[in-house]
UniProtKB/Swiss-Prot annotation:
Protein name, per record: Peptidyl-prolyl cis-trans isomerase B
Organism (species): Schistosoma mansoni (Blood fluke)
Family as reported in the entry's similarity comment: Belongs to the cyclophilin-type PPIase family. PPIase B subfamily.
EC supergroup of this enzyme: isomerase
Gene3D superfamilies: Cyclophilin-like
Position of sequence motif Prevents secretion from ER: 210-213
Subcellular location field: Endoplasmic reticulum lumen
GO biological process, one term: protein folding
Length: 213
């Protein structure tokens, strides 16, 4: 009868570490990335890169991706996040943007028309750095979005999660810390000066946790 030899310590450690990595990166898969180059009162700040979960919420991701690229709709309207602002900022909650028409939270529209239905609620607001659709109630998605700065589980089942910050969470934190007025509007103009799409050749999973700084 053959006797199994014990695994060498280095090999055993490698197996354990690989298992830990796999268990940590067990969240949704990033299929596309977009970038936002941020300006504060006209001064360049830095770039935020967001991973999008195109296999889980393809329609919502396509809307966000096209608005990041900039597109002209069949009705002749131009839709783009470029030049829009983060119009609502609440510390220890979220930063909100995407209103490229009125810049105050009352406007914006989707590539599918003014509004489109909630795609699904498969993903949750599990920590800081998660991207979700802002809305005015069920099935009222347009172009507005928010990025969480804490876990916001009370929003699960009400807002569609479709991405996560993969680079530049420290910039999100800086925006979160900006001074606001009584209506949660930043005193300074926080603008998306430039934005666009970054292709992802090989989809990768993210962790179900806070985005790294």
């Amino acid at each position: 009868m053959a006797v199994l030899k014990p695994l060498c310590p280095l090999l055993l450690l490698s197996i354990i570490c690989f298992g830990l990595i796999r268990s940590e990166a067990n969240g949704p898969k990033v299929t596309d990335k977009v970038f936002f180059d941020i300006e504060v009162d006209g001064k360049p700040l830095a770039r935020i890169i967001i991973g999008l979960f195109g296999k889980t919420v393809p329609k919502t991701v396509e809307n966000f991706k096209q608005l990041s690229i900039g597109t002209q709709l069949k009705d002749g309207r131009t839709a783009s996040y470029k030049g829009s602002t983060f119009h609502r900022v609440i510390k220890s909650f979220m930063i909100q943007g995407g209103d490229f028409t009125n810049h105050d939270g009352t406007g914006g529209f989707s590539i599918y028309g003014d509004r489109f239905p909630d795609e699904n609620f498969k993903l949750r607001h599990v920590g800081a750095g998660w991207l979700s659709m802002a809305n005015a109630g069920p099935d009222t998605n347009g172009s507005q979005f928010f990025i969480t700065t804490v876990k916001t589980s009370w929003l699960d089942g009400k807002h569609v999660v479709f991405g996560k910050v993969v680079e530049g969470m420290n910039i999100v934190r800086q925006i979160e810390s900006e001074t606001t007025d009584s209506r949660d509007r930043p005193v300074k103009s926080i603008k998306i000066a430039s934005c666009g799409h970054i292709p992802v050749e090989i989809p990768f999973s993210v962790t179900n946790s806070d985005a790294v700084e």
